[in-house]
């Protein structure tokens, strides 16, 4: 198993910027000293995910996951610790030497995880073979010529790892079998098909192959395109598998992530060739859905990275309909700012770039975007005879309903003027009609609010409460916490952040244990961490803790706000609070026992328990809690 020197791990951890790394996966906004965004580990519409650049940690107050930059990538991308250190170093452009093992050991993984890891490995190997066949063999010559004639450079073929599946039944079957791969598993992965006689054969034959990656950049599927005949579907995609769900996958999303984040917008296209041509033309933030309409899962994925989308679909009727559906989803579900780039009729982005050139496409891309409202007003014209008065009135009413949805008065004025000019109406007349539309729109929103489901009671614990103690940075919803919980938090946080504090508190605690088991477990980890001679560093401490729940507890503690100055008097107060709570809990247990003995007329035990309660009351009243 590969190991990395401790000093290299420390260098990467200390020099990496957690905001920059996580920002490649989550759209982060600055709030006070920290950054917040939608958690990538559970579905949510209100941000509860917080990243601290000062402490170099993340924590989600919704699902409880937390950690440092390494644990984020381990959780999000399914990496080993060594792989996560390597990826952080690469993403941070750090010049450190980290070697990864050639093959990942999956023997200790659960069966399901082990099988999916092997499926991914099979796809990686298969993609390399397909690409080699296209670029280096005689069998790939026709496909290579076809791609070059379409204007694709060899550089793009390599960037996108495009390949060719020859017209044989056993190219991939034999290739995988020679490497000891399970052919039944390869079938379940969508690489092979089973014939009626039970023999496994290649699923893809005589097709140009486009690898499909997940949001971790791993190849998990293929789309094969016919190029020299018409005896089958133009595109053949991998079936749904344990590693591939087309409702959740956008072509080129992982590779475009950095450009999307930098430009603060994403470009949606329909086809693989459109995305590849756009990349070659310099538009690097383009993605495409996998032969399906944009889904809610796609929309949520986009929302996590940006608030703006440019839809650049085909210029035919089907493309316009698809743009309307996609834009409606993004606006109504995710509240994105949507623009539409309409190409000439019958042209897709790939056609346009090949016919007009990259520079013309970039010019159109930057200068001819339609706002979502402008596109919808244009869309509402379709199949309407605007020479007919009834059709005109219906069209104007529909347009006013769209204009009524706009928040900005300037925008409303602009579109009203356009309508007034086109139909020779006064803008005052349209404004009167618009006011009625606004009233109707407000009534609709009020009715919708009456029908909203009640807030789940389980969420109320996270809601701000009157008189709540603000223990956390304001990114976390305020909670009213008990004194003993506050004490445990402050003691553990103080110990993690200072070896001197650890030694002092350990001495003051003596035989006293933490009330909550997870704090007691974390305390045990901390004792071992300092016993190994490590310095106080919560982010480094996280790496020594194998349990994900413990990492989440550490990150939550690091979000706790502590008093400016804490020393022995404060620590003694916290420990007294902890001891008092334990005695109070013991008293409650004895009172329950007393009630039981009283019902059972067990006088002997009743007297014994009463004496114990009297003794506890004396301790609590005197302050002698030991």
Curated annotation (Swiss-Prot):
GO terms for molecular function: DNA binding; DNA-directed RNA polymerase activity; zinc ion binding. A zinc finger (CHC2-type) spans 39-63. It holds the Pfam family DNAG_N. Binds 1 zinc ion per monomer. One of its GO terms (biological process) is DNA replication, synthesis of primer. It catalyses: ssDNA + n NTP = ssDNA/pppN(pN)n-1 hybrid + (n-1) diphosphate. InterPro entries: DNA_helicase_N/primase_C, DNA_primase_core_N_sf, DNA_primase_DnaB-bd, DNA_primase_DnaG, DNA_primase_Znf_CHC2, DnaG_bac, DNAG_N, DnaG_primase. Mg(2+) 2 binds at residues 314, 316. GO terms for cellular component: cytoplasm; DNA-directed RNA polymerase complex; primosome complex. Keywords: DNA replication, DNA-binding, DNA-directed RNA polymerase, Magnesium, Metal-binding, Nucleotidyltransferase, Primosome, Transcription, Transferase, Zinc, Zinc-finger. NCBIfam families: dnaG (TIGR01391). Belongs to the DnaG primase family. PANTHER family: DNA PRIMASE (PTHR30313:SF2). Monomer. Interacts with DnaB. HAMAP family: DNA_primase_DnaG. Contains an N-terminal zinc-binding domain, a central core domain that contains the primase activity, and a C-terminal DnaB-binding domain. RNA polymerase that catalyzes the synthesis of short RNA molecules used as primers for DNA polymerase during DNA replication. This is DNA primase. It comes from Listeria monocytogenes serovar 1/2a (strain ATCC BAA-679 / EGD-e).
